[in-house]
């Protein structure tokens, strides 16, 4: 649970065969508790009994109506394979009336919605979902392209060094290993760090 607190985004993987299970619900509640933006991937779609649509509907009913199928996206360059789903338009139009206007006059595409979608994902008002198979690789590249396209952070390398220590353990020789996620600046091998604080550098 401590590790979850340093995540910028999370990818929650759900089986396309078994659907939402007990551990899925537990993870979802923890992600909501720490207000972590979530991308969803429905896995095992290469199996005969897998059902993407059924699992997607279950996620919308059990987790949030803001879970939205993003399968119409095809690449990271703004070339999208289909029309923007009405569900996505309605969610985005709550904050941006111009999106609804563009949708009604037929000029709307995902490339024109990118900033709105990034903001919605980051604030937990949209949970993008795609499907595929980790075993065969089907859908993985498309999902990662979507993730890189819409997952953004504010960290800057030129800022003063700061970070959060989220785990400390010892290796087989008894040496202490400290796991840190940086939230600003940069650090290199053999750098010395001064001015430590509890849970922070």
What are these regions (language model features)?
Residues 1-201:
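Structural and coupling elements of P-loop NTPases
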């Amino acid at each position: 649970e401590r590790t979850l607190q340093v995540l910028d985004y999370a990818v929650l993987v759900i089986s396309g065969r078994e659907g939402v299970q007990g551990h899925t619900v537990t993870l979802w509640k923890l992600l909501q508790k720490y207000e972590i933006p979530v991308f969803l991937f429905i896995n095992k779609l290469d199996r005969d009994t897998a059902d993407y649509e059924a699992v997607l509907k279950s996620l919308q009913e059990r987790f949030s109506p803001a879970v939205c199928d993003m399968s119409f996206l095809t690449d990271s360059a703004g070339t999208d394979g289909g029309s923007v789903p009405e569900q996505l338009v309605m969610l985005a139009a709550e904050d941006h009336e111009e999106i609804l206007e563009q949708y009604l006059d037929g000029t709307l595409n995902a490339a024109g919605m990118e900033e709105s979608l990034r903001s919605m994902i980051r604030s937990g008002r949209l949970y993008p979902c795609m499907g595929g198979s980790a075993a065969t690789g089907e859908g993985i590249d498309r999902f990662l392209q979507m993730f890189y396209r819409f997952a953004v952070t504010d960290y800057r390398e030129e800022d003063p060094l700061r970070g959060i220590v989220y785990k400390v353990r010892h290796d087989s020789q008894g040496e202490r290993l400290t796991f840190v996620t940086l939230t600003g600046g940069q650090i290199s091998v053999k750098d010395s760090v001064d001015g430590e604080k509890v849970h922070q550098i």
